[in-house]
From Swiss-Prot:
Residues 136-165 have a biased composition (Basic and acidic residues). InterPro entries: DUF3654, UPF0329. It comes from Encephalitozoon cuniculi (strain GB-M1) (Microsporidian parasite). It holds the Pfam family DUF1609. This is UPF0329 protein ECU07_1890/ECU10_0010.
Length: 419
């Protein structure tokens, strides 16, 4: 063996020895086992602590990011409907757990499930997540303290009223000061009502043919432009009229459907009030981009949001699907709108572009008359209102004869927080 060959051999041997020592390091494998246990426990706590719609949102958000990523190889891991594995520094995770505790570790794991890449998780990011968790805990403590103070205040007011009532009953006859005491009690009562009324939002206002509850009206500057295709507007009509129009139409999938089928489909398709949210400036907080594709000669875009539909004493969780194409002026036209009941196990199909494209309507008549979303008004006799809250948007359909009776309720949930 020449000196040169010997040198190469020794370098290879030294490298193999170092790599072997790394692979068979007991300390390293103990550390990995500890990190795996921490991550598995965090996943368990996350999944068990979420409501069904929250878990759907978590899986949909992470799965959507994975699906839209550029494929790096020819493997079919995506078809398994799992999030791809990520490579993350085990020492960093273990140090974060020891320094900040389980809540921060759990949030780090949640962000990984939401699609955070391992290369983006460094010490700076860990500190940032820890700050978010601390702020969240601080707000929670403040809210708890505020609730306790309000409860104590209510008890003190009730006690004060009771003492005054006893004192009043103990007096004999009417005193000259009685009228002033009655006025004082009346003023206190008015103050209490005003304090309670301060927590109630502004009175309902008319928005797009609906009554909208949700504080101050926003300017139209931040609102988005949308048009509604006739095939979407059709579902706002009576079941008999819907069946008549579908039977005369060109879409084979809807021809010949029974009236009972039409009634069932109307429940999940007649949700045009969702456009009030879709047009708002914070629509991206609720809807996630599900990608674009070409079909039937047009480029189509799809958006989905997690929701729940309450009707007939039942509650279904699923996704709100929105399909659009752009007209000649570049304005998005909503040609597909539906609530799709979805289980945890089938969320992969709902967000898979290939499955969606295959099931989408073949051709949409882009020349059909469309209506501006801001001019949409439900047919006479339909009573519904929209209610916008911090983490959700609700559309409530009521009985026109008895508005205390809720016929249907669609709740659209805000997307999970990505740090």
């Amino acid at each position: 063996m020449s000196e040169e060959e010997k040198k190469v051999y020794l370098e290879d041997w030294r490298s193999a020895k170092e790599w072997g020592g790394f692979l068979y390091s007991i300390e390293r494998w103990e550390r990995i086992a500890e990190v795996e246990k921490i991550v598995c426990n965090a996943c368990k706590e996350i999944c068990l602590g979420l409501r069904e719609e929250e878990l759907l949102g978590l899986l949909a958000e992470g799965g959507m990011k994975k699906t839209l990523k550029e494929e790096f190889s020819e493997d079919k891991a995506k078809d398994a409907r799992y999030l791809e594995y990520i490579v993350v520094d085990d020492v960093l995770l273990l140090d974060a757990h020891r320094e900040y505790g389980g809540e921060v570790t759990k949030e780090l794991v949640r962000q990984m499930l939401l699609g955070k890449e391992g290369k983006d998780i460094d010490k700076r990011y860990v500190d940032r997540v820890a700050g978010v968790v601390r702020e969240r805990q601080r707000k929670r403590e403040e809210e708890t303290e505020r609730s306790v103070k309000e409860l104590v205040g209510d008890e003190e007011k009730a006690k004060s009223k009771e003492e005054k009532a006893k004192s009043k009953r103990g007096r004999k006859g009417k005193s000259a000061s009685a009228p002033s005491e009655q006025e004082e009690e009346k003023k206190e009562s008015e103050v209490e009502e005003a304090e309670q009324g301060g927590e109630v939002e502004a009175l309902p206002v008319e928005v797009g043919g609906a009554r909208s509850k949700g504080g101050k009206k926003k300017s139209k500057g931040g609102r988005k432009c949308f048009k509604i295709h006739r095939r979407v507007l059709r579902w706002t009509k009576s079941p008999e009229k819907i069946k008549e129009e579908w039977d005369k139409g060109s879409e084979e999938r809807w021809k010949g459907r029974s009236l009972e089928e039409i009634k069932e489909q109307k429940i999940v398709h007649d949700i045009t009030g969702v456009l009030e949210l879709l047009r708002s400036e914070d629509a991206d907080r609720f809807f996630m981009d599900a990608g674009k594709y070409r079909k039937g000669g047009s480029e189509r875009q799809r958006m989905v949001a997690i929701g729940a539909l309450e009707t007939g004493g039942q509650r279904m969780t699923g996704v709100v699907e929105v399909g659009t194409f752009k007209d000649g002026d570049g304005c998005p036209v909503v040609y597909h709108l539906r609530f799709k009941p979805t289980s945890i196990g089938s969320i992969g199909d709902v967000i898979n572009p290939g499955v969606v494209e295959a099931s989408d309507v073949g051709r949409v008549d882009e020349g059909e008359e469309c209506e501006d979303a801001d001019k949409f008004v439900y047919p006479k006799g339909v009573r519904f209102e929209t209610v916008k809250e911090t983490g959700s948007f609700q559309i409530v359909w009521k009985n026109p004869s008895d508005t205390s009776e809720v016929l249907r309720r669609l709740i659209v949930y805000c997307r999970p927080c990505v740090i």
